[in-house]
């Protein structure tokens, strides 16, 4: 059986990257929440 996690940097960035977050209103909300919480890394 094939494992579910098949790592790919390109897929990772396109789905969870900074530009992907900035592209939608909800993604920007995610970034703002993480900034407010004081996260060291905002994305990926």
UniProtKB/Swiss-Prot annotation:
Residues 1-44 are annotated as: Disordered. Residues 1-19, 31-44 have a biased composition (Basic residues). The keyword Ribosomal protein applies. GO terms for biological process: translation. GO terms for molecular function: structural constituent of ribosome. GO terms for cellular component: ribonucleoprotein complex; ribosome. InterPro entries: Ribosomal_bL34, Ribosomal_bL34_CS. Pfam families: Ribosomal_L34. Keywords: Ribonucleoprotein, Ribosomal protein. HAMAP family: Ribosomal_bL34 (MF_00391). Belongs to the bacterial ribosomal protein bL34 family. NCBIfam families: rpmH_bact. This is Large ribosomal subunit protein bL34. It comes from Coxiella burnetii (strain RSA 493 / Nine Mile phase I). The gene is rpmH.
